[in-house]
Amino acid sequence: GMSEQGLIVTIEPSEEMIARSEDYLRRAGLRERVRIERGRALEVMPHLSETFDLVFIDALKEEYGQYLDLALPLLREGGVVIVDNLLWGGQVAGEIRSPDQTASTEALREFNQKFVRHPQLRAEVLSIGDGLGYGVKTNSGPSVF
C-alpha cells in the first residue's frame, strides 16, 4: 500500500469530473491523500517537479508517446509506468473495425513499439483487459521480462 506520507497526483481537464472526484474522495476520507491538477496533461506535466514511484497513463491514445516522454523524467529509477488500452479491442493486432478509430489504432501501434523498445524501460504489453503496458524505469537498457 501507499505510505502515510504518500500522495496521489492526478490530472483532469473536466471541472465536472473534478467535482465528482472530490466528492467521492471526501466521502471515502481520502481527500487529503489526492492532489488534483486541473488542465490537460500535456500542459500540466511539464510543470510538475515531484519524483513519482508510479505513473498511470490512460488518456488520448494519439498523445500516449508525448505522455511517456513527459513522465519518464519524473519517474524514479525502479519506478513503474502502466499504460491502459494498448490492445484497443484487438484492433492493434488485427483489422481496424471502426474507421473513426483509425488514428487512435495507428498511434497505439507506434506507441507499443516505442514502449517495449524504450532504452529507459524494461517493458511489455500484457493481454489483460484491453491491453496493459507495464514498464520499469532502468538505466541499463531494455530487456524482456
Regions flagged by a language model, labelled:
Residues 1-145:
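S-adenosylmethionine/decaboxylated-SAM
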